[in-house]
Amino acid sequence: MAQTLAQKILQAHTDDAVEQDGQIVQCRVSMVLANDITGPLAIKSFYGMGAKKVFDRTKIALVMDHFTPQKDIDSANQVLISRRFAEEQDIVHYYEGGDCGVEHTLLPEQGLVGPGDLVIGADSHTCTYGGIGAFATGMGSTDIAAGMALGETWLKVPSTIRVNISGDMPRWLRGKDLMLMLIGAIGVDGALYKALEFGGSVVDALSVEGRLSMANMAIEAGGKAGLFAVDAKTRTYCAEHKRPGVLENMAADSGAVYERVVDMNVTGKEPVVACPHLPSNVKPVSEVRDTAIQQVVIGSCTNGRISDMRDAAEVLRGRKVDKGVRCIVLPSTPTVWKQCLREGLIEVFMEAGCIVGPSTCGPCLGGHMGILGDGERAVATTNRNFRGRMGSLSSEVYLASPLVAAASAVTGYVAGPDQL
């Protein structure tokens, strides 16, 4: 039968015949991921189920990115649990020190995930890797423990929503805007346990980093996975990021059956923001401009890559952050950090008055390095803006692209780069 991209990848990882959506299949996994928050829970379950050794020490990644550098005793002890497990099991891909970055930027960058892979992670934004053609999805720590022990997991084959994006891409629009527009259109449950499969002329022209940014937020529409076809851009990205040997394109079959098709035309569209307190509360920047803010965060697994840093620097170069705003810039891996140094972007950020920090999730989840106080308002390039997500329950978060975030830092209110 003609298969969607999700069905095609799952078929490659199971001995069962993938014949219909909703079918339960037992699949071999390519990589199992956990972090400093979810790892200890998975480790406890791993030993609790009687497991002794991981199935493959090269196919597990433990990335200490959420509360690191360790912000307090509790977070330090969480890392200790993961570090000791990595030592006991001789895990190859353990990241904590100077090699550590935000997991969903780090793994594709280091070639640990790639096209056609099946990746499970104890983090909801594991779906990021669909940007390079992997079926990647978040799971609870018990399922991750079983995956670490057995190298297998079970999945219900998701139905697929095809998203076609066409038109002329405006200068200031990015993948983040496209994804926010989609979530605004279908809602936070519009793709509940479904795969989002992206295509169209705009997607074809989009950079791989832009695709990763979009796939990252598939879960914000309830998606099981967000998937992009493997093309020449994907192959080039993989070759440049320690994953050579990707020689063939991979896409859905002609005639594949979709539950629904969503068509978007971006011609003439302006940048958008997701207003408090849902990623689906999406409005054009022009409708909320002049909303005063106290903080900007540029980074995270959604928008902390080098293309994002370049966008932010383009806006900030030669300008100053408003005196009433804290602008926090967090390049999401050491590799991105070093590239920022080579290109002079760190100097641009510092001259503008930004606070430049380490590669950490930090403020995204209200962890550290940028917590919001009572009544404070932020523009962030992160992926969630639920009430209290970045601090006080009375604070507010507007989700945006790095271009909009940087412009907002300069003006002191929600603004697009075209306003400068």
From Swiss-Prot:
Gene3D superfamilies per UniProt: Aconitase, domain 3
Superkingdom of the source species: Bacteria
UniProt binding sites for [4Fe-4S] cluster: C301, C361, C364
GO process terms (BP): L-leucine biosynthetic process
Database matches in SUPFAM superfamilies: Aconitase iron-sulfur domain
Keywords: 4Fe-4S, Amino-acid biosynthesis, Branched-chain amino acid biosynthesis, Iron, Iron-sulfur, Leucine biosynthesis, Lyase, Metal-binding
Note on cofactor: Binds 1 [4Fe-4S] cluster per subunit.
Enzyme class: lyase
GO molecular function annotation: 3-isopropylmalate dehydratase activity; 4 iron, 4 sulfur cluster binding; metal ion binding
Pathway where this protein functions: Amino-acid biosynthesis; L-leucine biosynthesis; L-leucine from 3-methyl-2-oxobutanoate: step 2/4
Cofactor: [4Fe-4S] cluster
Catalytic activity, as annotated: (2R,3S)-3-isopropylmalate = (2S)-2-isopropylmalate
EC number of the protein: 4.2.1.33
Cleaved signal peptide residues: none
HAMAP family (UniProt xref): LeuC_type2 (MF_01027)
Biological role: Catalyzes the isomerization between 2-isopropylmalate and 3-isopropylmalate, via the formation of 2-isopropylmaleate.
Subunit structure: Heterodimer of LeuC and LeuD.
Family: Belongs to the aconitase/IPM isomerase family. LeuC type 2 subfamily.
Protein name, per record: 3-isopropylmalate dehydratase large subunit
Gene that this polypeptide is encoded by: leuC
